[in-house]
Amino acid sequence: QRQCERLRDCYKYCMSPKRCTYGTCYCEPSP
């Protein structure tokens, strides 16, 4: 299943989303 259609969808998975690629969220590393 797709996590995201656009970057802002990733905020439910990531504190700092980096990109949404092919429905998958990629996050900035947490400090």
From Swiss-Prot:
Domain of life from the UniProt record: Eukaryota
Post-translational modification remark: The N-terminus is blocked.
Keyword Cytoplasm (UniProt): no
UniProt keyword Cell inner membrane present: no
Disulfide bridges in this chain: C4-C20, C10-C25, C14-C27
Tissue: Expressed by the venom gland.
Chain positions with Pyrrolidone carboxylic acid modification: Q1
Subcellular location: Secreted
Gene Ontology MF annotations: potassium channel regulator activity; toxin activity
GO CC term, one of those recorded: extracellular region
Keywords: Amidation, Disulfide bond, Ion channel impairing toxin, Potassium channel impairing toxin, Pyrrolidone carboxylic acid, Secreted, Toxin, Voltage-gated potassium channel impairing toxin
Proline amide modified-residue sites: P31
Comment on protein domains: Has the structural arrangement of an alpha-helix connected to a beta-sheet by disulfide bonds (CSalpha/beta).
Stated family: Belongs to the short scorpion toxin superfamily. Potassium channel inhibitor family. Alpha-KTx 17 subfamily.
Function: Blocker of potassium channels (Kv).
Name of this protein: Toxin BmKK16
Lineage: Eukaryota, Metazoa, Ecdysozoa, Arthropoda, Chelicerata
